[in-house]
Every structure is written in C-alpha cells, then in structure tokens.
Amino acid sequence: MDPPRLRVATYLLLLSVGLLLHGGACQPYYLLRPIPSDSLPIVELKEDPGPVFDPKERDLNETELKSVLGDFDSRFLSVLPPAEDGHAGNDELDDFDAQRWGGALPKEIRAVDFDAPQLGKKHKPSKKLKRRLQQWLWAYSFCPLAHAWTDLGSRFWPRFVRAGSCLSKRSCSVPEGMTCKPATSTHLTILRWRCVQRKVGLKCAWIPMQYPVITDCKCSCSG
C-alpha cells in the first residue's frame, strides 16, 4: 500500500477506535433492543368496509373541498396519482453519492479532532487529508430524507400524500450500530370522510384531521 493510502487507512482506524470508546454506550444492546418504525402513518381506523360508507361523486367537488381544507400545498398533497419521486424508496445510496443531497458540512463533523498523534508520531494530517476525512465521515453518516407518495384511499381528501421516510438499510455510524431515525416531523391537514349512524339515517361529512409526516432524519441509536 502506498504511503498516502496507508496514512488515510491509519487515521480511519484510529478514528473508529475513538468513536467506539466515545459512543459505545448504545452499541452492546443494538441487537437486543427493539427497533422503532421510521414511518408515521395514520392510526388504523376501524370502519365498515362497505361501499355505502364511501363518498359519492357529488361529495368530491374539488372547489368546495379546497375551501373546507383551506391550505392546499401541492408539493405534498395531490388529488390525482402523481409521478413518483426519483429517490423514493432508494435505500442503497452510495456513500459519497449522499453528498449530492447538498447542505452545509455538519458542525459535529467539523469539530472532529484529526490532529491527535497517530501511534506516537507527531505528524499532523494536511488540510487536504482533513477535508477528505470530513467528507468521508459526512457521506457515511449522512441521513437523507426519502419521499414517496402514499395513496390513503377514497375516504381521505386529497387521497395522495407525499410522506417522508429515513433510509436505514445500513448503519450510519463508525463503528456500526446506529441507524438513520426520524428527527423531526410536522402535520399536514387533510379531510376524512366520516359517517355516523343516526336515528334519521346515515350522516356523513368531511372532517379535518392531522396527518403526521417526517421532515428530517438523524443518525442515532436504536430504541
């Protein structure tokens, strides 16, 4: 192995050992602790599946429903089946391809000390080597947010919601053990078709409800 590659490999080895000692608290129980879901779906509603409880064509006037809904954000809501996002469901992003998602270098990566002596030597890494190590760490630990359109069915309006999910097929930490998990979320207002049996018969109406969606992902311990 030529000297530059050997130097990079040595720094990565020492960095891995340091991170293991620093973040080992969550590591031993990685395979023993339950892993939470990275999605935030609507709580399953117990409803009669009969078509009599479905909205009729006269109940789907788009102008009236938009008036009831108020804020209609077409980036996340759609009445008709939309085209899928290019990165939807992609759980196998290449390490350095993650940089294409953009953004500033995280402060946690900038704060990593690469000047610690390696194996008793006094050599310090060059600025170029530091930058390469920072980029490698960023690409490896980066947790992009993937979007995909979800069809909620005819009893929700608009029935298509663009929901976020965290790519978690591989570990995002050095050493392995941490995965990408939801960090923040928000709520979209949509309408739900609700029918209630009254003495005078079936009473149905569109009612507003909050639909939770993930807005950011972060590399963190499981559990």
From Swiss-Prot:
Glycans are attached at N61. SUPFAM superfamilies: Cystine-knot cytokines. It is found in: Secreted. Keywords: Chondrogenesis, Developmental protein, Differentiation, Disulfide bond, Glycoprotein, Secreted, Signal. Residues 1-26 form the signal peptide. One of its GO terms (biological process) is negative regulation of cell differentiation. Its main location: secreted. It comes from the Eukaryota. GO terms for cellular component: extracellular space. Coiled coil: none annotated. Disulfide bonds join C143-C180, C166-C217, C172-C219, C195-C204. Inhibitor of bone morphogenetic proteins (BMP) signaling. Homodimer. PANTHER family: BONE MORPHOGENETIC PROTEIN INHIBITOR, NOGGIN, NOGGIN. Belongs to the noggin family. This is Noggin. The lineage of its organism: Eukaryota, Metazoa, Chordata, Craniata, Vertebrata.
